[in-house]
């Protein structure tokens, strides 16, 4: 809160030590949600795949490669031009692009009568002709399918919602359409697009041409599993020039992968021999990572002159490619590419620190004075916790909502203590379990290995009491709050967020906040 500058200047001159010790008085007690670990600056999470893509793009450009967008839609004939006789087998793994045909819709008198019945009025003169022109224009592709409803509503002079009903009941052929495939495919690897690109630029740019692209590819896998997706990202590059050899691939691989911590490299012939590469040039790249050891990370080769000639390209071209998901799995030590790519579709994994942020108070005082009173109640209760009862200790006196209020911590029953054995328990999260534990040797491992939530039963109960005391003070009344046995989080004023509860139950973790608290806090209006 703001403080009086002049007052502290004077106090500094006359009593420096006193002014120094008075410093904490200018701090406004925070709400429980403003106390760490619930209060923290959260960093937004970048997706590991897109993070890897960003790093790959930066690495390529730092090596002097220009970025390109490579065609996604590949005509079937291009696959034959690149793979030759092998193309028939290769096409088994690609997706063909298909779509719904546009029907030739006839308008009979029966249909016109059905439309008139739906719109509850006779069709105006010229409406039949307008409707026929509209459907004919749709058939000819003069407007898109998502505009059909609007165009028909204009022709018929009715609302779009009525047209939807007409299409559903009067023109059933729209619902009976079956998709038809074209001869266009989605690229299954970046090479398909590189050949098309090289055909247009190889003799129009200075040599050597160095370009890269990081983008999606599509492969018709029989099923997706821990290491295969039907769509994935490929980080691919080409180097085209008269003197290009396989040594180019080795140099590019080292320059690119060293940016990810790989320190040593091995190159060995790939057992798979793609027909678009020259014989003996298809090479697997293995990199040694300080954490993960030797892993396969890329493949390169020199495009076959037989394939390049189909596109009129007359210089050798080195192509290197790697799966982004594969590299990201190595870097993050992920075991399942599905969970790495589509994490939101799988149960989340939370650290103990993550879980602490979802544990807070159900009720707490709304005023700064109320929060100061919480601290006073805690100090008084802790100082006299073992005092035998009956006993009563004044904890705080001050103003709440225009009334002078006095608060005491007491235990009216005989032959017990001011606080119960669990009143000083502190809440920890350890290996996903939420536990309220005392400061004893028995629970030393919980405190050593767990993450403190920053809430004790004493703190949560004192906040509950002050919240109720404030409510009573608003109407000029005193009140008494008593907490006995804790069996559930709410018994000690604790709120566990739904995502934390779901994580605990889904993973069969423990939630144990039980214990004898036995604490009574009473207020009265002076």
Swiss-Prot record:
Q: Which InterPro entries match?
A: aa-tRNA-synth_II, aa-tRNA-synth_II/BPL/LPL, O-Pseryl-tRNA(Cys)_ligase, Phenylalanyl-tRNA_Synthase, SepRS_C
What PROSITE patterns has UniProt attached to this entry?
AA_TRNA_LIGASE_II (PS50862)
The EC number(s) given in the record are 6.1.1.27
Single GO term (MF): ATP binding
What reaction does this catalyse?
A: tRNA(Cys) + O-phospho-L-serine + ATP = O-phospho-L-seryl-tRNA(Cys) + AMP + diphosphate
Assigned keywords, A-Z: Aminoacyl-tRNA synthetase, ATP-binding, Ligase, Nucleotide-binding, Protein biosynthesis
Q: What biological process terms from GO does the record include?
A: translation; tRNA aminoacylation
Please list the residues that bind substrate: 189-191, 234-236, 276-277, 319
Q: Which domain of life is it from?
A: Archaea
Summarizing the function annotation, the protein's role is: Catalyzes the attachment of O-phosphoserine (Sep) to tRNA(Cys).
Subunit and partners: Homotetramer. Interacts with SepCysS.
Q: Which family does it belong to?
A: Belongs to the class-II aminoacyl-tRNA synthetase family. O-phosphoseryl-tRNA(Cys) synthetase subfamily.
Task: Specify the protein name.
Answer: O-phosphoserine--tRNA(Cys) ligase
Q: Which gene name belongs to this protein?
A: sepS
